[in-house]
Amino acid sequence: MAGSATIVAGLLLLVACACCIFPIDSVTIPSSCCTSFISKKIPENRVVSYQLANGSICPKAGVIFITKKGHKICTDPKLLWVQRHIQKLDAKKNQPSKGAKAVRTKFAVQRRRGNSTEV
């Protein structure tokens, strides 16, 4: 009797540990994933940046637009307006900023006969 009680207690302990290590019906979705998409077009002037929600990590591949107010909005990357927003944001990112100015530098140029001239 003591032997079978020990075996049953050991099995119950093993099952309890397995449930803690491998939770049943538990799926962790990263916070940077989209579970659903909005259907309404976001005005272009409200969007400041975007992130890609990777389909290999997330249940759905999506584009997360970040608005001026800091809201994160999941959108379907297959939609034409989403693709256009991405292209325009990428183009803005690659342009020099409006505050940037051309910098003039002076340096000596060595010419024949040892003369130097500033340019």
From Swiss-Prot:
Glycosylation sites: N54, N115
Tissue and organ distribution: Highest expression in jejunum and spleen. Lower levels found in liver and lung. No expression detected in kidney, thymus, brain or testis.
Pfam families: IL8
Localization of this protein: Secreted
Domain of life according to the entry: Eukaryota
Induction trigger: By interleukin-4 and allergen challenge with A.fumigatus. By interleukin-13 (IL13).
Knockout-associated phenotype: No visible phenotype in normal conditions. Mice display a normal base-line eosinophil levels in the hematopoietic tissues and gastrointestinal tract. However, following intratracheal IL13 administration, mice show a profound reduction in airway eosinophilia.
Function: Chemotactic for resting T-lymphocytes, and eosinophils. Has lower chemotactic activity for neutrophils but none for monocytes and activated lymphocytes. Is a strong suppressor of colony formation by a multipotential hematopoietic progenitor cell line. Binds to CCR3.
The protein, known as: C-C motif chemokine 24
Gene this protein is translated from: Ccl24
